[in-house]
A protein has these predicted regions:
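Active-site-proximal segment of tyrosine recombinases
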Residues: 174, 276, 283-286, 293-308
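Catalytic-site neighborhood detector that most strongly recognizes the C-terminal catalytic loop/helix
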Residues: 291-294, 305-322
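Alpha-helix N-cap/helix-start motif at helix boundaries, enriched for small hydrophobics
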Residues: 15, 172-175
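Conserved tyrosine-mediated DNA breakage-rejoining catalytic core shared by Y-recombinases
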Residues: 176-230
């Protein structure tokens, strides 16, 4: 996989995902960890049979990881030894992609989405109720301390604000670091690519920097920056008044940073008994924001950039008929 990283410029997160897929295949089929591409050739029949039992999206993702391993330097360039088996996996990927897009084309919810779906207005209402609770508890900028329960409430309020006062992104906020202007200007290109930052320029001015290696979709130029809107800036000021760590989101009042999985668990707790993740919030947001066809065409390109996905993904995957 080191060759893949050097030759293709693939992000570390993608490399880790490829490794997980290949190791799972090897463990499930041979009981041993993945060693090299010979396994993908000698066990091709078993691998394809194994993937035939999986969902379209799983089959598609595993096929992509296999093809990267068989053609590490660039796409569609395996050695002659692996050309035949590469084409078999390429066919599997193409068929999986076609079935996946076909299943999403009518924008109908699946059973899981139907069970957990709420409107965007309900998300807003929940956020506003948290704000009222905090005010009732006397949590404000002039407070000198905060209880553990109110600290948790405040973080819940922050999370819902992050995903409603800006077009909702994926789980990038989980590992985001807080830095000041000087620290930001001192960062080199590698650090900007590898990390996500909240840059605290002043009480009235902040921005987010999303690194190209920390997000799913490709970002040109290494990182993407977005100015924090006024209402979200006020929420952040209140949060930073009590959160003295350099982590935007924390697992406890002591300041330990979150993982992406922990952010998902926090969202599940906020929306309980509904199981709502960042992916579901993105679908809810886009379904709400795009009205008639004219309005949809005017908005979708700008929204897609802010949410870090393509317009086609917004149309085919995220926007749901309700």
């Amino acid at each position: 996989m080191e060759e893949v990283k050097q030759s293709r410029g693939v992000r570390d997160t993608s490399i880790a995902l490829y490794k997980r897929h290949l190791n799972k295949l090897a463990m499930d089929i041979t009981g041993k960890e993945y060693e090299n591409e010979k396994f993908l050739k000698t066990k091709a029949d078993e691998i394809i049979k194994y993937l035939d039992d999986k969902s379209n999206s799983v089959r598609r993702n595993f096929s992509a990881s296999i093809m990267v391993a068989l053609s590490p330097k660039q796409k569609n360039s395996p050695t002659d030894e692996y050309r035949g088996v590469y084409e078999r996996y390429a066919k599997l990927l193409t068929e999986g992609q076609a079935k996946y897009l076909e299943s999403k084309k009518d924008n109908k919810m699946n059973s899981k989405e139907e069970k957990n779906w709420i409107s965007f207005n309900e998300v807003i209402s929940l956020r506003d109720n948290l704000s009222k609770k905090l005010k009732k508890e006397g949590v404000k900028m002039t407070s000198t301390d905060i209880s553990k329960s109110n600290f948790d409430l405040l973080q819940q309020y922050l999370v819902l604000s992050l995903y409603t006062l800006l077009p909702p992104r994926r789980n990038e906020y989980a590992t985001m670091k807080i830095i000041n202007k000087k620290e930001y200007l001192d960062l080199d290109e590698s650090e900007l690519k590898k990390n996500n930052y909240l840059i605290n320029l002043s009480k009235t001015n902040k921005m987010f920097s999303y690194g190209s290696e920390k997000v799913k979709s490709k970002i040109e130029g290494g990182n993407n920056t977005i100015n924090v809107p006024k209402e979200l800036n006020s929420v952040l000021n209140l949060w930073l008044h009590f959160n003295k760590s350099d982590n935007l989101l924390v697992t406890q009042q002591g300041g330990m940073g979150m993982t992406k999985n922990q952010l998902t668990l926090l969202l599940n707790r906020i929306f309980k008994p509904k199981m709502i993740s960042t992916s579901m919030l993105r679908k809810i947001y886009l379904t709400n924001i795009f009205g008639d066809e004219a309005e949809r065409n005017n908005k979708k390109e700008k929204i897609a950039e802010q949410m870090n996905h393509s317009v086609s993904v917004a149309e085919n995957i995220y926007i749901k008929d309700v």
